[in-house]
Amino acid sequence: MVEYKIYIPDAIPDKHKRISDLIQRKYNLKVKKYTSAKKIAQDYGQAIFELMNEAYQPLYGYSALSQRQIDQYVKMYLPILDLRMVTLITDADDQLLAVGISMPSLAEALQKAHGRLLPMGWYHLAKTIFLKKYPKMLDLLLVAVKPEYQNKGVNALLFSDLIPVYQQLGFEYAESNPELELNGKVQAQWEYFKTEQHKRRRCFVKGIK
C-alpha cells in the first residue's frame, strides 16, 4: 500500500479543465452540490455507499458494506461533513455516477488532544469539524466512479469542481488514502498534480516451524 501527499495547485490543470468540459458535454453529466446534510442523505445517502461497493468491489481486500453499515454511515458521517467538499456527478436522469468526498485532516487536532477525547480533547476535534478552523491538510476520503464510466475522465470533472473549494478554504495539500501499489487507475488521478509518494506499507509472511 502507498499513500501520496498531493499539493493543491494554484489553478485547475489545463488538461483537467479540457477533459472535464468535454466529458460533461459528451455524456450530458451534471455536477450536484448540497448545503443540507438532511437533503443529501435523503437524495443520495444510500446511493453514495452503493456506488462505493460497486466501484471498490474488484479491489483486493475490499469487503462490501452491509445495509446496516450503510444506514449507520449515512446517519453518522454525512452530518459532520463540510458539504462544500462533497461533489456528486449524475447523468441526465439524476442517477449517481461518481462522488468525491474530502474533509479537513484531523491529525493535527488529534495530536493536540494527545489522542484523548477527555478532558479537553473533544474541543480540538470540534474546532476543526464544527467551527471550521481548518488545518493546511485535507484528507481525500472517498473517490468512487461507476465502473462503466471509469477511465473516461469523470475524475477530472470531480476535481475541477473541488480544487477551487480547496483553494478558497486555504488548504495547501491533500493526503490520499492507502492505495494498492498496483492500482494504476487510482494513481493515474494524480498524474497532473505535484505529488510525493511519502508512505508505504508492507506485510511480510514468515512460516513458523
Report the location of each language-model feature.
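Acyl-donor-binding surface of acyltransferase catalytic domains
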Residues: 1-35, 204-208
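Conserved GNAT acetyl-CoA-binding A-motif
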Residues: 137-138, 166-180
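A conserved beta-strand-loop-helix scaffold within acyl/acetyltransferase catalytic domains
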Residues: 33-145
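Short beta-strand segments
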Residues: 3-5, 88, 101, 175-176
